[in-house]
Amino acid sequence: MNDLDQPSWTAWRPQRFGHVDVRKVRDPLIEPLWIGERVTIELETSGPRAQAGPHVAILDEAGDRIEDFPAVEAGLVEVARATSLLIDGYLTDQVERGPEHSTIPAVAMPKVGDLTRQMLIGGGRRREEFTPLERSLPANPEVPTTLIAVDLLMVDGESLLDVPLLERKRILESVLDENQFVRRGIFVRPPLDPWLVSWRSIGFHSIAFKAANSRYRPGLDNDGWAIARIPSR
């Protein structure tokens, strides 16, 4: 592997969730927390690094390269609508598993309004209870895997770190299409009620609250981001 094929942004680690209660996140964008491996992905389709073809590097949370998902890399090249991208996302088999393989035990579901109250009012859990839900789970190359793009850190060589999250997501939508191997993460704004039961039924354990105006700080905690567990009963 020559120097031009080496990843450029290994020092940029995914931004971490903060230590605050979700109720303190101002003007949140709310999204299901994917079960999978948190990664950053760099793509270049023109320039010195792409002389022999598109350059794609998938990096784990330690900045080490993951080379076991060529179909995902090829899928990303197919749907990219910019000459270079740096993406925050997840490698997951959750899309292909579907609800029939949900790991959530079958229990009686509360009413939708009760779900929201339990999460926001009765959710006096400590942060350490959520730590396992944040932990990145290594992706398995033996099963169908999808890249879920949830944030955009750079486009066409221009850093977006100081661009508000909502605008970063809008830009992501404009520069990344979708296919079998690449999807954009979904997000909603309050009220949550129409979404909680649906998300839980298809296998999500937790949801992320991210301030719409938050900036991105690679490798650091951001108290504009928080996690809440979806109540199970």
What does each model-identified segment do?
Residues 1-233:
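Catalytic cores of nucleic-acid ligases and guanylyltransferases
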